[in-house]
């Protein structure tokens, strides 16, 4: 079965590298990552080295596929290694480059699996979702992290927000493809500008995920339109402003004591550590949460860049562990406006 499915996906990895973007990344990331950049670069510019994880849908479990994956040497992301690791979430990885085709959307039929970069699961795990909680996925399209959240627990309410209308349609289709009707009833999809969410729904959610718009390194490196790519690079400096505004809006939407996870799929310090440092510096009611235990737990499957921010992690790809880039930071909204103790997360 797996061989047949894999054959259908061959030929999809032929991509054309965008020199404009690569030159910019070479200039920036050689400074920010130092010697690590050459290793990361080798993976990012070589799609044949990329790996894809297979997240099972617990609402239509693929038992036959699971047997086939075991025979091919796939293994699960370390289940039970974290105190809050959800037993209901099952994701398989291969240590060698391999890709199955995505399943087609069929109205009324649930898909059995979702393909994703395995590092995308880390923000979901960091959120520590529990049954009955009110959850906001602020920038939810295309829906992979929303699907992953629903593999972890049964929220009392899940708001999946996506401001971009075409991406919002993609999000709705993804949810319809993976989530059964009874659970769909506790999910709402909105198209609000994420910067306005805090004012629209103040102090509403127990958990908020901000998977922010960013300079998606993998995607940008293979931009087909060089002029559009050059424009993106020029406009890139504006992204941190948007990202900070999204995080501040998400904080407003959090209940006191609520948790926020911020994530991007870029290596950019300006869009990662600097965003979190700006938020922590400007808001005394936000407490950084130590997530260094995630790096220790998942070091066999992921490579993490060195950091002095214990509230954040940066997954960097290397051969055999071609996951990422993925930046994750975790914050907690205080119960009052008293001055926070900044022992966990130092502004960079």
From Swiss-Prot:
Entry GO MF terms: tRNA (cytidine-5-)-methyltransferase activity; tRNA binding
Keywords: Methyltransferase, Mitochondrion, RNA-binding, S-adenosyl-L-methionine, Transferase, tRNA-binding
InterPro entries recorded: MeTrfase_RsmB-F_NOP2_cat, MeTrfase_RsmB-F_NOP2_dom, RCMT, SAM-dependent_MTases_sf
Keyword ATP-binding attached: no
One Gene Ontology CC term in the entry: mitochondrial matrix
Positions of the catalytic residues: 265
PANTHER family (alphabetical): NCL1 YEAST -RELATED NOL1/NOP2/FMU SUN DOMAIN-CONTAINING, TRNA (CYTOSINE(34)-C(5))-METHYLTRANSFERASE, MITOCHONDRIAL
Protein name per the record: tRNA (cytosine(34)-C(5))-methyltransferase, mitochondrial
